[in-house]
Amino acid sequence: VADMIELGRIKAGVVVDAESSRGVVEATMDRLLRPDVNSEKFRLNFPTLTLGSGAVAVVLTHRDLGQKHRLVGHVSLADTVHRNLCLGSPQEMLVHAQELLKAGLMLARKTWGLGQKFMGWDSSNIDFIVGHQVGSKHFTRLFDLFGLDQSRTFVTYPSLGNVGPTSIPLTLAIAIERGLIRKGYRLALMGIGSGLNCLMMEIEW
């Protein structure tokens, strides 16, 4: 949508995402209750039980239509060598959690490096960070890796779970409602997804 706006094809667009976890969570619980489940099957299936459900919509416009907040730009990278570390379907998700965490952090570090090079990011000039809502271990490792202050973020995974791609805009919306985002803030939105894919975006509030 942002590309279409910049190319002059449209003036405004709506980006929508919805995540529903009930089906896969219930199917996973049924599988884990079977008598033939061993520790390996449990380990691969357990992350599914952390999923949540939610929906978001974001309106993007040309600067002529709105001056409130600005999407400055983004950087992204993929590392498809690790595409098999998380495999999902409507009925099952299998996750090699430790390997996924390690590979995801490596990709995040490279993507952050692009942000430093092309967007001028560093640990002192980003005012607020909204990251992918997976869990406390992932957050701590990511913030330590970049030298970021965890007081400059907000998390929703303890109450909403991991709502996939919906997590970042959903968490941002709640942070705004709670008055955590101030005018002039440089916001960094950091998403890491299975594939592996990583996208980091800056918004000037």
Label each PLM-derived region with a short phrase:
Residues 1-9, 105, 109-112, 127-205:
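Claisen-condensing/thiolase-fold acyl-transfer catalytic domains that form or cleave C-C bonds
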Residues 3-12, 61-68, 122:
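Secondary-structure boundary elements
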Residues 6-29, 79-83, 136:
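Acyl-CoA/ACP chain-elongation machinery
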Residues 12-14, 56-58, 69, 128, ...:
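Structural motif
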Residues 13-19, 60, 189-192:
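Short beta-strand segments
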Residues 23-37, 83-84, 138-150:
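Acidic-glycine-rich active-site phosphate/pyrophosphate-binding loop
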Residues 34-106, 110-113, 192, 204-205:
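Condensing-enzyme catalytic core mediating Claisen C-C bond formation in acyl metabolism
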Residues 119-121, 179-180:
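Glycine-rich helix-loop-beta junction characteristic of Rossmann-like nucleotide cofactor-binding loops
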